[in-house]
Amino acid sequence: MSIPAAQVAHLPTRIRRRDGSQAPFDNDRILSAIRRAGEASGEFAEDEARLLTSQVVKVLSHGHFPGGIPDIERVQDIVEQTLIAANHLGTARAYISYRDQHRRLRADRQTLVDVASSVNEYLDRADWRVNANANQGYSLGGLILNTSGKVIANYWLSHVYAPEAGIAHREGDIHIHDLDMLAGYCAGWSLRTLLHEGLNGVPGKVEAGPPKHMSSAVGQIVNFLGTLQNEWAGAQAFSSFDTYMAPFVRNDGLDYEQVRQYIQELIYNLNVPSRWGTQTPFTNLTFDWVCPEDLREQVPVVGGVEMACTYGDLQAEMDMINRAYIEVMTAGDAKGRVFTFPIPTYNITPDFPWESENAGRLFEMTAKYGLPYFQNFLNSELKPNMIRSMCCRLQLDLRELLKRGNGLFGSAEQTGSLGVVTINCARLGHVYQDDEQGLLARLDELLFIARDSLEVKRKVIQRHMDAGLFPYTKRYLGTLRNHFSTIGVNGINEMIRNFTADRDNITSEPGYALACRLLDHVRKRMVEFQEETGHLYNLEATPAEGTTYRFAREDRRRDPGILQAGSDKAPYYTNSSQLPVGFTDDPFEALERQDDLQRKYTGGT
């Protein structure tokens, strides 16, 4: 049909399909849909359909759409509104019913999993998920987990989360992590509780009392972490490992070689791919190095019997444990390959012995493998007992837990993250180029979707835990009230590049300032979320191993002109708000440039 020239000049030239791809805008398709709807209801025919189409086109010509491109749903909304305004209520009802019917059909198709395709994609390694997890090899267990994971993911997206969350994830605006598991993200546990009570308390399962010797303590730790790993998607952590294990060294009268043997057994057994999907359990151990002040006067209990000493008297035993752990990790396995787990985290406190032999061994291991994480308590108001580190980068600031009313130390080790949602920041920069107000408005929409999905997940996991789906979590944790909901960001460097048409990136002053404003905005919203929900929220520099590729691949498919890192065949986005890969090989320059940004993350970096 003919359109007035003035309207043609302002009409969109392209339209965005539901899968995110674009197609040429064709007003005749609008005319066809309206005409068929009118004929079906019997309210009007060709002439009225043309008049209504011209009204829809007029609205579109004056509309403001992200990137100047309307999506199909928005066009159909305008058609609906036009039919109602013209008093064609019967046609409008039929049109709305038609849309809803087809929406449900699309949802049903998305929920279905093509079994043959899923299995073949894995066997042929054609699915990017095959390599998305560095801890899961190509195996029968991986095939089973990959296939079942698609079913669970569709269950979350189609039957648990609100439709807007499913749409935002599928279209790559956000990434809801661990959709393939009906479980929480990561958890920290009390090693002291395990050693005092033993591995027991779950009906119908084998029980063990408190360990009396280091050998049985190591066995219970391995079994505990492996068992709990099967009830969580991510990392399982123990804190103060050297402090709590030192009494067993003293009680058994062990020499260094014996301690080293037990530590070797611990590390080897925690690197065996015994977890679902033939994965290695994702584990983290935090080492105090020097006995924390709040534990120094406390009396250890071994096998239910108090010892004739305090934790503060066991520094020599702690030193043996730390030496053994470092030497075993540095040596690697029988072929000299690095042990991936447990990831060690070391507390750097004012009394850290920098000149000791163990410190030298620690930094040699760091130089060789880059293995450990360090928690810096120098010039900090925080104390080691106030922070517990777990997972890749989830570092929990437990000052947030003071308001929970159950004491700081008692809840310190019983924390974690229930779920993670990452925002695709690169796309925001591309769609809202030079429009910071529009970018922040869309960011808010995505943050609200993230919040709502995390709140839903909290309710679902708590309900299933109460019903016995996670028996060991129920036994050793019981409540999720001290677990955070985590929101992360990805591709801030590419966001800046796209936002400024590549004039700036995160290394330039304007780009850095934009990154700071964005993170401050997210932090402000998260404080509001905490006040609204009564639940803990934190901002994490998401590792985004597979997510960064998924975002980039999806955006490249939608618009090949978007600025990305990597190559055409392997695009990616720079992790969180980090410097571009290869920008500098000077670690001190990198630290200086990232200092203010990294401090904005409340959940780890």
Predicted regions and their residues:
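Charged, amphipathic alpha-helical regulatory modules used
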Residues: 2-118, 122, 479
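Short, hydrophobic beta-strand segments
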Residues: 13, 56-63, 247, 494-499, ...
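Catalytic-loop motifs flanking and including active-site residues across diverse enzymes
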Residues: 26, 30, 237, 485-492
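Amphipathic, well-packed alpha-helical segments that form the structural scaffold of globular domains
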Residues: 35, 57, 451, 455, ...
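Core structural elements
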Residues: 78-84, 288-289, 471-495
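A structural signal for well-ordered alpha-helices, especially hydrophobic packing surfaces
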Residues: 83, 87, 106, 454, ...
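Conserved catalytic cores of very large enzyme subunits
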Residues: 104-481, 502, 508-605
